Amino acid sequence: AMPPAERVKFMPMTDLKTYPNAMKPAWNNNGLSQGMCGSVFIVGKQWKEWEGRLAVGYAGIGIHGTPTGNRIDILDISKDGKSAKREELLWPTFAGRFRHVSLDHQGNLYVADEASGMIYKVTPQ
């Protein structure tokens, strides 16, 4: 429960002192304390510009300015893996904690919510 600005001093996302040749992250969560709880690459023409992007679910803890979960990001990772653009999905639901995202064989996206015990099917508009 350490404030993010303090925690980063002790727990950098990539420790370049210990691992100077490590690949730097293409994206980070802006210092927020939200655990990534599952991700999947989106497959299927029905997703249009999102096909091939990474869907990531979060389980935020709601302290030090960090929102609770109920968030899915769609990451467009560059071909060289050195950068990414983020698009946040807006959910017309309660504040839950998304625990996992998954695709079925038809390319439908499913999201598991810890608070409600529900699994939501997400389809493109």
Q: Which residues fall in each region the model found?
A:
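Beta-rich catalytic cores
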Residues: 35, 97, 115
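Blade-level signature of beta-propeller repeat domains, shared across WD40, Kelch, NHL, RCC1
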Residues: 102-125
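Beta-propeller domain segments
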Residues: 1-87, 106, 122-125
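Conserved blade-ending motifs and adjacent loop-strand segments that build the rim/top face
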Residues: 83-105
